[in-house]
Every structure is written in structure tokens, then in C-alpha cells.
């Protein structure tokens, strides 16, 4: 009880600091519960404090808006960044609020939180389930925590790295992308939390997934005119890298057109054999061939596509469409063959997905 009270006190402090109570949000009399489906994270407008979390149940075609607000009587915060599902918990990273919430995925209630972070980006948990990591954009420190107690345990300072982005666990290795103004992947040993390797990829690596063959796929956006790149590193075209998780050697690099951009991060299906991303359309790469197909899987009108997720069981494809980036967005659900199944409205700037089956 004391622990829960402490968590709620910290949550209250965060609320007073910027996540103000949502008095205008109606509260359901019945307790809301979630038993499957997908959570959709909506980024909201930077500095407006209007991030939101939605839930969709595909079998019942039910949409629940403002999951966090309804469960905790507080707003989620400013500029929600990512989701991570683990052992009955849904970790929600809220970048500009400097906080990570651990929610009960069946109720949306806060079970723990980590605050006073420096622009947090992603969460990863090691294979033993005893160590958690939080990446941060504007500092070389990666925060560590115990997923069992939801208590912070310390931090790791990355040598030669200004900030960290998406992370991937493979065995006792933690791969950390350094997106902002850099071109490196850092590797930690999760048993010792020691930095064991750093290798170069394209400019500004920001998204990674691991396939069933222990291959690490990395998207690099190539930088832009605002990037403050290290000496000797210049802006380049976006690229997709295929890298051995064991040796850290690149076995293939796909170069895209200069001036182009990836509209989503990478996603992979539950069997780990098909890679998905949005460039100018939705593309799917069969890892057996490792080749970019001649035609995209799905073509969508407009320029609002902002995120992609793959249901690990049904392999349905979820596309987050931010529309005009100023009004409510939409999620489009497709079959793995690229046929549209249904659509549903969500909040402002939808971008990330987390599935119950994960």
C-alpha cells in the first residue's frame, strides 16, 4: 500500500508539472477492461500536452479513446514517443514530459513511473526479465531499472555517443541506435552493462528490428540541413542496413533516393520472416530473398502515414495516418495480402502500436 501511495504521489507531482487533471473527460461508471487487441499511441502536438492512448479490439470493432485519462483521471502528457509491452505491463514513453509510465495493460492504471528523464525515447528489457533500459535523446546516459519492482537502478554512460534511440535485445547483447546527429550503433553486454562494441552505419540510424535469422535491420534517415553531424560525416540519402547480430558486419545496404524519407519505423511480423516499412508506400521484404520488391504491397493516398504495426498473430497490418497533423488521425487495418479490412478514428498524430499478443 505504501508503495502504491508513493507511485500515486509521484504521478500527482507529474500532473501538477504539466499533465493537468482531465476534468472535462467523462469517466465511465463501469470499470474499463482490455482483453486483447491493440493499443494506439497518439503523439499529439509538441508542447501542447495533448498526447493520448487509444485501444482497438478488432473482433468487436470497439474503439476506446483516452485510455490513460479514464484510468488515472490525468492527461498522458506532452509528445508521446513509444510503447513497449512486457509481462502484463504496457510501458508508455512520453518524450517532452520526461516520463515513462508502466500501466496495467488490462486496466490502463499506472503501476509505476520513471520521471525527471532527459527526452526519453524507448524501453527495452533483457532476456532474463531482470533489467530494463530507457534510452534518452539528449544525453549519453541510458537509465536502468528493475522490471519486477519498477524501481530505477542506475544509469549507463555511453562512450562517444551523444544520445540514444531505439534498442534491440539479442541474447546478452543490447543494440542501441544513436539517431540524433550520429551514425553509430552501440552494443552493451546485458550481464555486465559494459559497452562491448560500437560500429558505424548510415547517418542517423533511428529504427531497428531483429528477424528470425538473427539479422539486425536498421533504417538510417540520412540527416537533414538541421543535423549537427560529427566532423567528417555529411548528410546522405536514406538507407536500410542488413547486419549480422553476431558479427556486427553489414551484409547488404539498400540506398534510397536523396531527399526521400521513411514515414515509419521498421516493423516485423510475428514469425520474423517479413519486414515492413513505409517509404512512399507500404513495402514488405521477404527475408528469405532479402530483396526490395518491384512494387509496394500497399499504396495509400496522401502524405499522413506516420507509423506501422503488425499483429504478431493475425499478421494484419496497421497503418497510422496522421492526416493533416492538426486534426484527429485514423488507423487503417489491412490483411497481410494488402487488402483493406477496416478503419477507425483515433487522436492527434497516431504513430505507435502495441499488441496484446506481444
Locate predicted features:
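Sec-dependent N-terminal signal peptides
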Residues: 6-11
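Positively charged n-region of N-terminal signal peptides that target proteins for export
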Residues: 1-4
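C-terminal motif of bacterial Sec signal peptides marking the signal peptidase cleavage site
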Residues: 15-18
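Predominantly soluble domains enriched in secretory-pathway, periplasmic, or organellar proteins
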Residues: 20-358
Amino acid at each position: 500500500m505504501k508503495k502504491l501511495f508513493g507511485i500515486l504521489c509521484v504521478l500527482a507531482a507529474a500532473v501538477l508539472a504539466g499533465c493537468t487533471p482531465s476534468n472535462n473527460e467523462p469517466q465511465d461508471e463501469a470499470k474499463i477492461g482490455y482483453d486483447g487487441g491493440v493499443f494506439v499511441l497518439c503523439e499529439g502536438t509538441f508542447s501542447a500536452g495533448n498526447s493520448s492512448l487509444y485501444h482497438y479490439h478488432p473482433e468487436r470493432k470497439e474503439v476506446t479513446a483516452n485510455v490513460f485519462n479514464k484510468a488515472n483521471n490525468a492527461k498522458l502528457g506532452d509528445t508521446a514517443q513509444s510503447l513497449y509491452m512486457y509481462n502484463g505491463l504496457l510501458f508508455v514513453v512520453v518524450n517532452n514530459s520526461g516520463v515513462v509510465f508502466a500501466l496495467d495493460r488490462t486496466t490502463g492504471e499506472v503501476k509505476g513511473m520513471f520521471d525527471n528523464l532527459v527526452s526519453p525515447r524507448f524501453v527495452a528489457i533483457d532476456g532474463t526479465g531482470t533489467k530494463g533500459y530507457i534510452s534518452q535523446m539528449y544525453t549519453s546516459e541510458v537509465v536502468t531499472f528493475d522490471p519486477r519492482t519498477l524501481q530505477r537502478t542506475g544509469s549507463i554512460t555511453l562512450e562517444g555517443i551523444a544520445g540514444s534511440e531505439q534498442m534491440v535485445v539479442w541474447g546478452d547483447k543490447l543494440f542501441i541506435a544513436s539517431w540524433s546527429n550520429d551514425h553509430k550503433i552501440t552494443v552493451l553486454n546485458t550481464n555486465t552493462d559494459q559497452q562491448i562494441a560500437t560500429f558505424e552505419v548510415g547517418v542517423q540510424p533511428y529504427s531497428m528490428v531483429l528477424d528470425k535469422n538473427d539479422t539486425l535491420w536498421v533504417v538510417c534517415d540520412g540527416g537533414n540541413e538541421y543535423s549537427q553531424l560529427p566532423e567528417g560525416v555529411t548528410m546522405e540519402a536514406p538507407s536500410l542496413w542488413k547486419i549480422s547480430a553476431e558479427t556486427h558486419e553489414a551484409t547488404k545496404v539498400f540506398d534510397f533516393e536523396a531527399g526521400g524519407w521513411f514515414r515509419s519505423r521498421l516493423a516485423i511480423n510475428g514469425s520474423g520472416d517479413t519486414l515492413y516499412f513505409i517509404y512512399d508506400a507500404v513495402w514488405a521484404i521477404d527475408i528469405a530473398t532479402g530483396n526490395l520488391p518491384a512494387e509496394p504491397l500497399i499504396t495509400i493516398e496522401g502524405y499522413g502515414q506516420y507509423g506501422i504495426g503488425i499483429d504478431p498473430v493475425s499478421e494484419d497490418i496497421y497503418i497510422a495516418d496522421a492526416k493533416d497533423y492538426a486534426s484527429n488521425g485514423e488507423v487503417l487495418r489491412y490483411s497481410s495480402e494488402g487488402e483493406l479490412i477496416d478503419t477507425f478514428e483515433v487522436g492527434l498524430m497516431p504513430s505507435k502500436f502495441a499488441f496484446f499478443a506481444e
